[in-house]
UniProtKB/Swiss-Prot annotation:
MF annotations from Gene Ontology: ATP binding; CCA tRNA nucleotidyltransferase activity; cyclic-nucleotide phosphodiesterase activity; magnesium ion binding; phosphatase activity; tRNA binding
EC number: 2.7.7.72, 3.1.3.-, 3.1.4.-
Taxonomic superkingdom: Bacteria
Required co-factors: Mg(2+); Ni(2+)
Residues annotated to bind ATP: 8, 11, 91, 137, 140
Subunit structure: Monomer. Can also form homodimers and oligomers.
Protein name: Multifunctional CCA protein
Name of the gene: cca
InterPro entries, alphabetized: CCA_bact, HD/PDEase_dom, HD_domain, NT_sf, PolA_pol_head_dom, PolyA_RNA-bd, tRNA_CCA-adding_enzyme
GO process annotations (BP): RNA repair; tRNA 3'-terminal CCA addition
Gene3D superfamilies linked to this entry: Beta Polymerase, domain 2 (3.30.460.10), cca-adding enzyme, domain 2 (1.10.3090.10)
Annotated source species: Pseudomonas savastanoi pv. phaseolicola (strain 1448A / Race 6)
Length: 409
């Protein structure tokens, strides 16, 4: 029995990055051998075990063979006869197909270290094209390692295009797709993930609503970058620079989907794109079974981001409706994330990255002004039910009128 450290742990050590998760592969052992040594079985599709002391995962060396469509369409074979090289060749990229023994000796049959030094993401074998999930994984690695100057090998990008055109991406489950998408959006440069999907043809298969934004012009006076797709990439980039959570990044990606529906005759204006885009945002949310918090914020940002930009122009009554829509009294954090998404939208324009966004503080102040209105005096006056709700709304409106008069010249 030989045990090797494999995959990301080896890659990240060679890159000089912190190693967080360690994967182990065991060569020359059977399930019975592992059980005798106290390892606990946890794998369902193939033999994976937990170490009796560290709880780290140890997998028996295995081969795989394509047997159907999609990510799950594989037959796995694990036995003591499977070699380390056979196990490594089934992996996606050469930089992930290296192994180290207990003495730190490197096994690198597919030149992963050479590609790591050359900053190239390259597939290990033609079997890469058998697993559609690898399109998303490579795009995610491109986003993660963009700061190191990594690029995708042309032949690998070709296989990604082949997979995108095959229709197999549609066989991916919502859960698997969302897991990759959400992880990619939280990388340091998530816009690279979307750009790669666009370049290889996967974006039009997975999110045609986002793909449709590329080539759609916007008014140059407000959007020097002009292209809506380029704008969305910039907004997403800003959301990562400012280290916003997944909810904000997802909303940034989807906020302008309505512009993809604007008739060409109306370009570059996009009247009412906030409302026309809502059904598209809803469709994308449902397609990937997106978590509720991400769904809600994406819809709210899609509907109200123009309100955010025009905050200082809004009538107090419209401002109150905006606050009510966000349930700002009970869910202040959601409104704060809305403000963040609006600010990223404003900064995601060429030349506007460092511009101030006074709307942010104005909206925060408005929310605070409305929150300071107490219901207790109204209860003491005997208001109940609908009358109480109406009276509370009127008091908040008064507070917002005062707030606007004090803050807008």
């Amino acid at each position: 029995m030989q045990i090797y450290k494999v995959g990301g742990a080896v890659r990240d050590r060679l890159l000089g990055q912190p190693v967080t998760d360690i994967d182990w592969v065991v060569v020359g052992a059977s399930t019975e051998d592992m059980l005798v040594k106290g390892y606990r079985p946890v794998g369902t599709d193939f033999p994976v075990f937990l170490h009796p002391l560290t709880n780290e995962e140890y997998a028996l060396a295995r081969t795989e063979r394509k047997s159907g469509v999609g990510y799950g369409g594989f037959v796995f074979h694990a036995s003591p006869e499977v070699t380390l090289e056979q196990d490594l060749i089934r992996r996606d990229l050469t930089i992930n197909a290296m192994a180290e023994d207990k003495d730190g000796n490197l096994t690198d049959p597919y030149n992963g270290q050479k590609d790591l030094e050359a900053r190239i993401l390259r597939h290990v074998s033609p079997a890469f094209a058998e697993d559609p999930l690898r399109v998303l994984r490579v795009a995610r690695f491109a986003a993660r390692y963009a700061r190191y100057g990594f690029t995708i090998a042309p032949e690998t990008l070709g296989l990604m295009r082949q997979l995108s055109e095959s229709g197999e991406l549609k066989a991916l489950t919502a859960e698997r797709s969302w897991k990759e998408i959400s992880r990619a959006l939280m990388e340091e440069q998530p816009q690279v993930f979307i750009q790669v999907l666009h370049d290889c043809g996967a974006l039009k298969e997975l999110m045609p609503e986002v793909e449709a934004l590329f080539g759609v012009p916007q008014p140059a006076a407000h959007h020097p970058e002009i292209d809506t797709g380029v704008h969305v990439l910039s907004v997403l980039e800003q959301s990562a620079i400012h280290k916003h959570p997944l909810t904000v990044r997802w909303a940034c990606l989807l906020h302008d989907l309505g512009k993809g529906l604007t008739p060409e005759a109306e370009w570059p204006r996009h009247i009412a794109h906030e409302h026309t885009g809502l059904r598209l945002i809803k469709a994308v949310n449902e397609r990937f079974r997106v978590p509720r918090e991400c769904q809600e914020l994406a819809l709210l940002v899609g509907q109200y981001h123009t309100h955010g930009h025009r905050a200082l122009e809004l009538k107090p009554s419209t401002l109150l409706e905006l606050l009510q829509s966000f349930d700002v009294y009970r869910r202040p954090q959601r409104f704060e994330e809305f403000i963040a998404a609006c600010e990223m939208d404003a900064r995601g324009r060429h030349g506007f990255e460092q511009r101030s966004y006074p709307q942010a503080d104005y909206l925060r102040g408005a929310a605070q002004a409305a929150r300071t209105v107490s219901v207790q005096p109204l209860l003491e006056k005997g208001f109940k039910g609908k009358e109480l709700g109406d009276a509370l709304k009127n008091e908040r409106l008064k507070a917002l009128k005062i707030y606007k008069a004090e803050h807008v010249a």
